[in-house]
Amino acid sequence: MLVIVLQGLAGFLSIIAILCQKRYNKLHRSIYGLSYDLFLLDFVGNGLYLYCALHYCYSSLVREQLSQRFPLFYPLNDARSIPISSFLILKDFCVSCCCMMVLRQLYYYRSTKHIYQGISITSIIIISVFLVLGIFTYGCSISNLPLKNSGKFGVFYLEHINYLWVMANLLKCFKYVPQMSINWMGCSTVGLSSKFALISFLAESIDLLGRLVIPTNALFYEIPFNSTPFWVKLIQFVTLLVILCQVQYVYVGRKPRLPKGKL
């Protein structure tokens, strides 16, 4: 599918954007004005996407339950019936690795952060709630195995994977909001690479326009499970547009004015 190819291209551009931000941090030996939450949410979101995609590919239990629920769409005797894109798996893995490198810089250059930087309480609460829900659904889904192919409270192992997929999309769709807020609180975008903002916006534009313009004959059950939903890309596009306006127009030339934060 051409749309999947464009998603892969957008992912490749996202990797370039993150590497540009990494280089910017290294050149300035500073992470002043850069959101911790942006790269944390992106890392966790892509990690969950990988977890779900690999289970859809290789978990016989997931494939069996999916086949029992939708036998016409995903027959058990057809190993290729569950649509998963290996290209997108590779993309998510590479993005996760790049985010990890920037997170390492955020720790290494932590002495240069200002008072509003750091992992926010909001992100900690959201990720903690998702972690508890993930552990709870996992425990419910395996409680009756291997005697029964079902879990407590009607939570099958397939539900556990599906819930994590929803959580991953929620984390990914709002990942740029913390950076937008940091820029607003500091009235500056000094810590954000203009190349990162521009290339990221270009990546989301290509992906979004590809879905809107290019016709597709794929039926709903043929769309790869690890393909990012349209509504996630739309929210990312809007928030990136705001950040790009902050970088290019609203806070252009503004100098940093906030004091350094605590280590």
UniProtKB/Swiss-Prot annotation:
Subcellular location: Membrane
One term under GO cellular component: membrane
KW Nuclease (keyword) present: no
Keyword tags: Membrane, Transmembrane, Transmembrane helix
Bilayer-spanning residue ranges: 1-21, 38-58, 82-102, 118-138, 151-171, 196-216, 230-250
Membrane topology: Multi-pass membrane protein
Ligase recorded as keyword: no
Official protein name in the record: Putative uncharacterized protein YCL002C
Organism per entry: Saccharomyces cerevisiae (strain ATCC 204508 / S288c)
